[in-house]
């Protein structure tokens, strides 16, 4: 369990995806989706890392590609691109497909980015000027998310995979701002979560926001399946959706059923805390002050979870949680690793000098 806790804490703090210039700050992506998209960069991230991106057709010489159109940067003067042998795609490229190539800014080499069927020129032209997520304002995020939600009806594998990966990198508060753009039936038909299990967490979050009979039925069935298996990666997302649908009035039941029940495993309890964290950070369906009040009860009944609560206390600069966290530190009921994590969080909230003045002698 201790190893799981460390992994969870890393995921909750965030995942930094670094590739040349594209960096995903840990505070942006909804943590209930962290880890579901895999380590590889999304199509958009790859385009961001290129100074030129274009569509081409493969010639009889497999390494040569005839340029069709450019959707980012300046069109090369030569009408063909010669791809390094190491960058050639695995297997055969369908004759009807266009090939997307990018000239990477840092390595100054051409890269194979994927294949796409003809007829998506306008979509690619919209992708070309997209910015790093680190540079997006709230309005930029909303516009970007609405663009990808509007792409769900395109029956094109590259586009649907891109939509999944980009929405998975979206802050939960932005997802909520796009509520009117969510269509539960379209989400299920397009993202096919039963066929692609890695998409289930994102779909659960979006269906929790969209609501309606179709969404509620899928969420209910998914919760039954998760309860049966007790090892699913979508538990946190399903609990976020539960909180979104039921609101703050359900918090007492949520605490009893999902956090303090004796039958729960530590991982299940921490998934529930992650769901509370997502809602508290968004400060929407569940106001942050209600999450903080529930955290006080968590610290009383499950002090072994204090390190995770402390992470949110630091992120929200929530001083009301400092006294109970200090009491837990002084009681010596958590592991050494948890003590260090809680100590760093307290220092972040109250400042180094005040923290060192008030800390327990055992921390010296």
Regions found by a protein language model. Give the residues of each.
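Short coil turns that connect the paired helices of HEAT/ARM alpha-solenoid repeats
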Residues: 150-158, 192-198, 225-230, 261-264, ...
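Bacterial N-terminal signal peptides
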Residues: 10-22
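Transition segments tied to proteolytic processing and entry into folded domains
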Residues: 22-155, 159, 165-169
């Amino acid at each position: 369990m201790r190893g799981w806790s460390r992994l969870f804490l890393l995921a909750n703090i965030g995942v930094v995806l670094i590739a040349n210039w594209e960096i995903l700050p840990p505070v942006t992506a909804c943590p209930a989706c962290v880890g579901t998209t895999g380590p590889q960069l999304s199509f958009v991230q790859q385009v961001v890392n290129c100074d030129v991106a274009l569509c081409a057709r493969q010639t009889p010489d497999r390494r040569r590609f005839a340029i069709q159109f450019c959707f980012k940067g300046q069109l090369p003067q030569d009408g063909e691109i010669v791809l390094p042998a190491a960058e050639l795609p695995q297997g055969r490229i369908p004759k009807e497909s266009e090939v997307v190539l990018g000239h990477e800014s840092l390595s100054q080499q051409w890269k194979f980015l994927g294949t796409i069927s003809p007829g998506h020129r306008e979509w690619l032209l919209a992708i070309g000027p997209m910015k790093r997520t680190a540079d997006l304002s709230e309005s930029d995020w909303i516009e970007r998310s609405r663009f990808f939600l509007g792409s769900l009806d395109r029956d094109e594998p590259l586009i649907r995979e891109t939509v999944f990966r980009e929405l998975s990198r979206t802050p939960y508060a932005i997802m909520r701002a796009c509520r009117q753009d969510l269509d539960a039936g379209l989400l299920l038909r397009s993202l096919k979560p039963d066929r692609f299990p890695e998409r289930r967490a994102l779909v659960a979050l979006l269906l929790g926001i969209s609501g309606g009979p179709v969404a509620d039925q899928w969420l209910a069935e998914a919760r039954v399946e998760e309860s049966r298996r007790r090892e699913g990666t979508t538990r946190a997302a399903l609990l976020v959706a539960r909180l979104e649908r039921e609101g703050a009035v359900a918090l007492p039941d949520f605490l009893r059923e999902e956090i303090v029940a004796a039958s729960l495993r530590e991982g299940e309890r921490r998934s529930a805390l992650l769901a509370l964290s997502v809602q508290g950070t968004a400060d929407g369906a569940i106001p942050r002050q209600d999450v903080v009040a529930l955290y006080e009860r968590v610290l009383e009944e499950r002090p072994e979870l204090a390190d995770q609560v402390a992470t949110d206390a630091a992120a929200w600069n929530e001083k009301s949680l400092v006294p109970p966290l200090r009491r837990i530190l002084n009681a010596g009921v958590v592991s050494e690793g948890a003590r260090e994590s809680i100590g760093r969080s307290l220092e972040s909230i109250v400042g180094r000098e005040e923290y060192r003045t008030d800390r327990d002698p055992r921390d010296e």
